Amino acid sequence: MSTAKLVKTKSSDLIYTRNDVAEDEKKATIEVLNRLVTELIDLSLITKQAHWNMRGANFIGVHEMLDGFRTAITDHQDTIAERVVQLGGVALGTAQVVNDRTPLKSYPLNIHSVQDHLKALADRYGVVANDMRKAIGEVEDEDTADIFTAASRDLDKFLWFIESNIE
């Protein structure tokens, strides 16, 4: 059994780490990271909602495409949440936090056509892709900016694929 303790630093609510990123930079970065964790969790759930409930032309292609998107989104959300902890923060990923903090409009539960889902998804992917790109310039920590850049590339590609399927 481990006897290790989580020790908070004296001047902050951060958990002690030997990571030498400046404390004020850590705090600001953690705030941005947690904002994006919230967005990615919500986007992954929205993606699955569409994946399960769409019907119509090109169903199987879009259905399978969305599965791949969700897997990648979940991978990025995990990397971003783990970066929060690496910097001494607490990753905020509960349903309650997501519900309280998401900037995404509530996903319509009364749509069924592939086209209606694609339009609703495009709106939400656009919000997250644009915020991810904005976040790259908001942080001073280069490792975090690199994580955001990788996620941004995927989100832009996913948005392009979604928009390319809208008739």
Curated annotation (Swiss-Prot):
Fe cation binds at residues 51, 78, 82. Keywords: Cytoplasm, DNA condensation, DNA-binding, Iron, Iron storage, Metal-binding, Oxidoreductase. It is an enzyme of class 1 (oxidoreductase). The keyword Secreted does not apply. GO terms for cellular component: cytoplasm. One of its GO terms (molecular function) is ferric iron binding. It catalyses: 2 Fe(2+) + H2O2 + 2 H(+) = 2 Fe(3+) + 2 H2O. It is found in: Cytoplasm. SUPFAM superfamilies: Ferritin-like. One of its GO terms (biological process) is chromosome condensation. Homododecamer. The 12 subunits form a hollow sphere into which the mineral iron core of up to 500 Fe(3+) can be deposited. During stationary phase, binds the chromosome non-specifically, forming a highly ordered and stable dps-DNA co-crystal within which chromosomal DNA is condensed and protected from diverse damages. It protects DNA from oxidative damage by sequestering intracellular Fe(2+) ion and storing it in the form of Fe(3+) oxyhydroxide mineral, which can be released after reduction. One hydrogen peroxide oxidizes two Fe(2+) ions, which prevents hydroxyl radical production by the Fenton reaction. Belongs to the Dps family. NCBIfam families: PRK09448.1 (NF006975). PANTHER family: DNA PROTECTION DURING STARVATION PROTEIN (PTHR42932:SF3), GENERAL STRESS PROTEIN 20U (PTHR42932). This is DNA protection during starvation protein. It comes from Erwinia tasmaniensis (strain DSM 17950 / CFBP 7177 / CIP 109463 / NCPPB 4357 / Et1/99). The lineage of its organism: Bacteria, Pseudomonadati, Pseudomonadota, Gammaproteobacteria, Enterobacterales.
